[in-house]
Amino acid sequence: MVRAARRKRASEDDLSRGCRAGQDCPIDIKNKYEQNTLADRILKWVSSFLYFGTLGISSGKGTGGATGYTPIGGGGVRGGKGANVVRPTVLVDALGPTGVPIDPVTPDEALVPLLESSGGSTTLDVPPGGEIEVIAEVHPPPAAGDPEITIGHPEEPPILEVIPETHPTTRVRTTVSKHDNPAFTAYVASAQLPGETSASDNVFILHGFNGEYVGPAQTGEDTVFEEIELENFGVPESPPSSSTPNTSFRNILNKFQRRLYNRRLVQQVKITDRTFLTKPSKLVSWEFDNPTYTDDSLSLIFQQDVDEVSAAPMAEFQDIVTLSRPVVYEREGLVRVSRLGQRGTIRTRSGLRIGGHVHYYTDISPIRPVEDIEMRTLGEVSGDSVIMQPLAESTFVDSGDVLNEGNIEFPDSTLEDDYNEDFSRARLEITTSARSRTSIVTVQEGIPPGSVKLFINDAETIVTPHGPESNDTDRYQPFIPVTPAATPDIIITFEEGTATFFLHPSLLKRHKHKHWFF
């Protein structure tokens, strides 16, 4: 048995073209190209209440729509670019549009009527709204052969008239500047008086010193010049309302204050802790900073992780990311210090932190109004003088009265001295003739083994004790020279260049000598 040969079926595109031409069409090809397959019918039924967008669920290509399929968790895939179109290197003439209709026109004679004229100028009379008549002069054509040129008589030389070319004139603008030095140039001005020719000129010499007028320029009835009162230009009529001028920095500060006190966008928080003025970073996070490298006058940036929740030292500074530099200004009669902070409560996948703005402020001290400040008078404006006494009240003395000896009288008892001199803490000063130096020795009572006795290494030195004065002449002690008669208990030796003393050998403490026997 011979098996029949299996022939290959034509492609789907060829079969579809045959179907459109009227050939027999397989049912599957017809349903596919007419979008009548089972999948197409299901999609049409379900699309009445569901929308699949551009997923491309049909019998077409599985390309995923216009943008293609996008994998989950990844970005889109760009399609490949088409082939580059090679442009020709030669110039291509642009062709006009085809099918432009051409309207036929009735042929007329292309003849211009010419009128003969006896010469002269040609006049064109154009009637309004009528045709233009052109009048031209017609000359006979030249005869055949070489033309004959005749220039005057043969004996005369030819004359050629040359007309020079005219060039357009160029505009030239010239400016002159003159600068005079008033130190070396004299300004001369004549008196402009009608009918006067004998008036002398006035010369003004302008230099660094005061000038002198030469000529009839005296004040009075014979004044030549007109005196014009000088006016000041550019001077404000009223002084500024405040001592602080309105500068650009003031405008920036006002704009910054309006931004801080916007309650719809910025949260207002008042801080009473004084650490906010010196170390605001301690209120945000628990950290130890080196004061050598920390400057609180700048903006502060805090590195915090949103995933790791940590409590701030102060609840008002929770989740603060940045703190601006401090701003000091006046607000409602108080000196206020403000800082603008931003929270970082939310973090996106891209790493961006989102949070609201917080305005932290604290008041330092009130500002007293100008009326409450007591002003002092500079200088004396009246005839009264004020004498200030620290131990008594102030006394007003009329300076108009002349003070003399007759007006001031004091009793003799005012000049008496009621104080008794006490020399219980007196010091004994001894002056030697070696270098004229004064040595001060403090005499203390009760030094064992007796009173202090002085040993002076100068025989000419005289010690003069002074006691309280008394009217009793018997108790008066004359000058007595001091000479050591016996060895004193304590010897004080004054040597040159030293201020120490040495004890007598008899007063030194004795040491026990231990004998060692071997």
Swiss-Prot record:
Keyword Ribonucleoprotein: no
InterPro entries: Late_L2 (IPR000784)
S-S bonds: C19-C25
GO BP annotation list: microtubule-dependent intracellular transport of viral material towards nucleus; symbiont entry into host cell; viral penetration into host nucleus
Principal cellular location given in the protein's record: virion
One GO CC term, this protein: host cell Golgi apparatus
Compartments where found: Virion; Host nucleus; Host early endosome; Host Golgi apparatus
MF annotations from Gene Ontology: DNA binding; structural molecule activity
Location of the motif Nuclear localization signal: 1-10, 509-514
Coiled-coil intervals, chain numbering: none
Processing after translation: Highly phosphorylated.
Keywords: Capsid protein, Cytoplasmic inwards viral transport, Disulfide bond, DNA-binding, Host endosome, Host Golgi apparatus, Host nucleus, Host-virus interaction, Late protein, Microtubular inwards viral transport, Phosphoprotein, Viral penetration into host nucleus, Virion, Virus entry into host cell
HAMAP family linked to this entry: PPV_L2 (MF_04003)
Entry similarity comment: Belongs to the papillomaviridae L2 protein family.
Function: Minor protein of the capsid that localizes along the inner surface of the virion, within the central cavities beneath the L1 pentamers. Plays a role in capsid stabilization through interaction with the major capsid protein L1. Once the virion enters the host cell, L2 escorts the genomic DNA into the nucleus by promoting escape from the endosomal compartments and traffic through the host Golgi network.
Subunit structure and binding partners: Interacts with major capsid protein L1. Interacts with E2; this interaction inhibits E2 transcriptional activity but not the DNA replication function E2. Interacts with host GADD45GIP1. Interacts with host HSPA8; this interaction is required for L2 nuclear translocation. Interacts with host importins KPNB2 and KPNB3. Forms a complex with importin alpha2-beta1 heterodimers via interaction with the importin alpha2 adapter. Interacts with host DYNLT1; this interaction is essential for virus intracellular transport during entry.
Name of the protein in question: Minor capsid protein L2
